[in-house]
């Protein structure tokens, strides 16, 4: 593969779905949306779910299929509420687009408001009034990570669709397609690493693959490259760190922690996040091997949450992470 190809193209744009059928891992939701497209009878929509699961791609695909390739750009606009959280974005940008007539004989236009849960309560109230005022010639598609942060009057005016986190199989299938198209060689552990770092986020998976391909343009992409380019610890190292600390070997665990912090260059928050993930994903064999009771697991999760909070408040990474390992070691019944 040519190195210039990696530099010139942004893969999340190149491989973004352009039709609803191409949106991965949301089969039930997509089938319901396709029924709206088929009749061109579209209500206001609210898409809820984690990042990188197809919410934006679905909104754009709806516009493409309803208006056609020639007219969808004229009848569709996308705004990101996290950039402008206040009421002005509703009063100006949204109203200016909503009050103009649809182009090309279309019955309505579509306004896609991404990260709508970032809008303040006042801005959401203004948005609700705007939705009512322009309902004859405008349809709103709102996207959010947390539907609980959308005021009830807006939710009641929308058909709500919940996008789930993508399965490992859906992520891998898309990565295999891209690898074939880009003529990439990816090892089995490379695919496993991409699935691990993505955590069900297709956008993150594709970006991680492109970053690794840029670093190793003419080599087989393995898990080492993936973890290095995404600033992620090898999950095996995290499991070993946890196991060492839980067995009471604090000094050995601290040495491994220092390696992750200073040699691997990982952040404290990333390490805590991976420790939490490893604890959550422990299988029964490891739980039995370490002698972990249900009560002890609850205590571990509780202290992980406390350390994570302290780090977000600006506490010293090394001290907090060592305190976490110390808590693990002290919980050893031996």
Curated annotation (Swiss-Prot):
Pfam families: AAA, Rep_fac_C
CC annotations in GO: DNA replication factor C complex
CDD domains found in the cross-reference section: AAA, HLD_clamp_RFC
UniProt KW Nucleotide-binding keyword: yes
SMART domains: AAA
The keyword Ribosomal protein is assigned to this record: no
GO BP annotation list: DNA repair; DNA-templated DNA replication
GO MF annotation list: ATP binding; ATP hydrolysis activity; DNA binding; DNA clamp loader activity
Residues that hold ATP according to the record: 49-56
Family: Belongs to the activator 1 small subunits family. RfcS subfamily.
NCBIfam families: PRK00440.1 (NF001679)
Stated name of the protein: Replication factor C small subunit
Organism: Methanosarcina barkeri (strain Fusaro / DSM 804)
Gene label: rfcS
């Amino acid at each position: 593969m040519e190195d210039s190809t990696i530099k010139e193209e942004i893969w999340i744009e190149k491989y973004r779905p352009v039709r609803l059928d191409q949106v991965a891992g949301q089969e039930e939701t997509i089938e319901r949306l396709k029924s709206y497209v088929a009749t061109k009878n579209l209500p206001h929509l609210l898409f809820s779910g984690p990042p990188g699961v197809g919410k934006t791609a679905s909104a754009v695909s709806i516009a493409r299929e309803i208006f056609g390739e020639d007219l969808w750009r004229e009848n569709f606009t996308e705004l990101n509420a996290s950039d402008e959280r206040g009421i002005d974005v509703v009063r100006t940008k949204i109203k200016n687009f909503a009050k103009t007539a649809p182009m090309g004989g279309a019955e309505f236009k579509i306004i896609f408001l991404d990260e709508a849960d970032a809008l303040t309560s006042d801005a959401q109230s203004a948005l609700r009034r705007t939705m009512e005022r322009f309902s004859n010639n405008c349809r709103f598609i709102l996207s959010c990570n947390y539907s609980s942060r959308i005021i009830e009057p807006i939710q009641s005016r929308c058909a709500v669709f919940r996008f789930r986190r993508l399965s490992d199989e859906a992520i891998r299938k898309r990565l295999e397609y891209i690898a074939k198209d880009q003529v990439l060689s990816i090892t089995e552990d490379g695919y496993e690493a991409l699935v691990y770092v993505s955590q069900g986020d297709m956008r993150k998976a594709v970006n991680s693959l492109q970053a690794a391909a840029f670093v190793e343009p003419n080599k087989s992409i393995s898990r080492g490259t993936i973890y290095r380019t995404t600033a992620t610890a090898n999950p095996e190292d995290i499991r070993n760190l946890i196991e060492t600390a839980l067995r009471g070997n604090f000094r050995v665990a601290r040495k491994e922690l220092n390696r992750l912090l200073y040699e691997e260059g990982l952040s404290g928050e990333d390490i805590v996040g991976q420790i939490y993930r490893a604890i959550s994903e422990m299988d029964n064999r490891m739980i039995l091997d370490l002698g972990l009771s249900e009560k002890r697991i609850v205590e571990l999760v509780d202290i992980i949450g406390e350390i994570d909070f302290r780090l977000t408040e600006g506490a010293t990474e090394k001290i907090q992470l060592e305190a976490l390992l110390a808590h693990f070691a002290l919980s050893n019944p031996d």
